[in-house]
Amino acid sequence: MSEFLLIEERGGVGLITLSRPKAMNALSLGMVRGIAGALRRWKDDPTIHAIAMRGSDKNGPFGNFCAGGDIRFFHEVAMAGTPQLEDFFTEEYALNYLTHHLGKPLIAFLDGIVFGGGMGLCQGATHRLVTGRTKMAMPETLIGLFADVGGGYFLSRCPGAAGQWLALTGQHINADQAISLDLADWHIEAAHQTAAWDGLQTLDWTKAQALDTWLQGHTVAAQAGPPYPDMHAWGLINRHFSHATVAEILQSLDTDPDPWAQETAAGLRKRSPVMLHVALEHVRRARTMSLADDLRMERDMVRHCFHSAHLGRSGAATDTVEGIRALVIDKDQNPQWNPARVEDVTLQMVEPFFQSPWPVFSHPLKDLV
């Protein structure tokens, strides 16, 4: 059990509170293991009728859900070359899979920050509740990584070209945008979350409509409307991010005088050129994959991110560790990507990220079906 988790059972509900406010509930290996252990136990417990998850901030429950994986930890263990890095990704991805296969309601209160690993933790929930404070993102390309934790699976199933846009740019989206892109289900007032959380624990689970009645009393369902709250941006997303390659996307953005297009192009050029190509190919491949196959592919990919043998790099020499250094460790915001330009990335640099370093029978996630 992790010191950063509060795990309880009340009123037939399994309750998980992420409680690492100084790190915006970034997931440690201990937290991953604690959450997975609780979910596995409750999955087969007939006295647990539903499971709920929330985060906390310095003021108490709610405020932020989860800022993702602990990237300081990633840097530390990558530099040290310890096996904990391998353990983290294997166990985190197995947890992501588990959240989709509990066989009972999983209610995620997605208040505040919901980034990266937080998205992986919540996208398998049957009930994803967002607030006016919600900020969702898959910002991994900013640190030379890709949208993992099942990101290929759930982003590739967003409408239009939204998945490619989110995977490449790491753009933050709000509650209404998340609902429109099928990344959330219901809106709940931030101030009403405590009452809703407490109310879950008083339901009569012998009544088939108990959870539906609770939802009606505490949330607002998505309303029929335009496919995206900002229809101007929606048109630009689909126009530019439907192109087949990163170079074509950038060329399309560069030739569009719209400020949105110019800002987006400038943002993309701050990302790792190699990982932009990898991230786009990842979403395209995942579109026809099961969740299990996508997670296995992502496990292969993340291994190559920290051990890019085909590029002759490992540890600090990889774009991933360099990106973490620049963003989080030294905070100079000046990563030295290799290569430095999108135009210099070749297929030979990208394709090996999708080749498994393990035979099928010994893959770390071979048991996912």
Question: Which residues make up each language-model segment?
Answer:
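Conserved CoA-thioester-binding segment of acyl-CoA-metabolizing enzymes
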Residues: 1-54, 364, 368-369
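Hydrophobic/aromatic residues within transmembrane alpha-helices
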Residues: 16, 53, 70, 121-122, ...
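A structural preference for short, pocket-lining loop segments at secondary-structure junctions
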Residues: 16-19, 34-79, 98-109, 131-134
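An acidic, glycine-rich surface segment that forms the CoA-thioester-binding/catalytic face
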Residues: 71-110, 151, 350-359
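Contiguous mid-protein beta-loop-alpha structural module that forms a pocket-lining wall or clamp
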Residues: 148-210
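Amphipathic alpha-helical blocks and their helix-capping loop/short-beta junctions
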Residues: 183, 189-271, 275
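C-terminal amphipathic alpha-helical interaction region
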Residues: 305, 309, 313-369
